Amino acid sequence: MSLRKVRSLPSLRVLAEVSNPLVRVPPPSFTYQTRQVHNTKKNEHSPMLSSDSHASFTRMSLKTLKNECRTRGLKVSGKKTELVERILLFEGSSSKKLHTSAIQRAKNDSSHIDSMKIPNVAKLEAEAESRKTDYIVKVPSIVNNAATEPKTKIEKDYEKKLQPADKKPLAENVGTVATPDADNVIQTPSVSDSIKVVNPEEELRSGSSEQGRSYSQQDEELTSRDKKFLLGFAGTVAAWWSLRFWKKEESKK
């Protein structure tokens, strides 16, 4: 390509845009790169120790400085420079105390404990006892009134069964049992009225006589049965023989 053709390229591009306005040649793309640097402003770590604190206190009047000393508990008398020095010294010492919890009276103490408070043991024990009494449930004693009247249906039925035999209610059949402690008495229902004391010899004799009676009754029952059986058997045999004999006589005739 010659130099003349190269020079004529811009003019040809313009003529093409004029002849065909709908067709536009896109502009050349340029890439931009930007770099931004962040700059953080420097701040003082403790504003009470800044260089402007001295200037701020020196600008104050004598009356305001006295008020500042009075609020900090410092001495009020003196010149302006003395008041400023007192305030600055106080601010410096207070800034150091922000990061420590040591007490002044424990300076020479090598222990790691700053202070210790002994609790009131008597007060704590009284509080514990009061808490215990709050949770105690007082149940009324029902030992003396337990056997007066039957409450449940089973007890009522049991009392009805015992009344015809004892002719006394269940509440009256109550005995006492002695304990090592004389103040305590255990009440128990007494069943001595329903117990019968039996002589063993008489019991054996009555048992043997009852057994003999039962055996004799069984013998009598067996003999009557045997008699009935024998009579029935004899009757059947006689009837059978009589029928046989009757048949033979008829055959002879």
UniProtKB/Swiss-Prot annotation:
Transmembrane regions: 229-246
Compartments (UniProt record): Mitochondrion membrane
Region spans: Disordered: 183-221
PROSITE patterns xref list: SAP (PS50800)
Protein name: Altered inheritance of mitochondria protein 34, mitochondrial
Organism, scientific name: Kluyveromyces lactis (strain ATCC 8585 / CBS 2359 / DSM 70799 / NBRC 1267 / NRRL Y-1140 / WM37) (Yeast)
Bilayer topology: Single-pass membrane protein
Gene: AIM34
Residues annotated as transit peptide in the record: 1-44
Intrachain S-S bonds: none
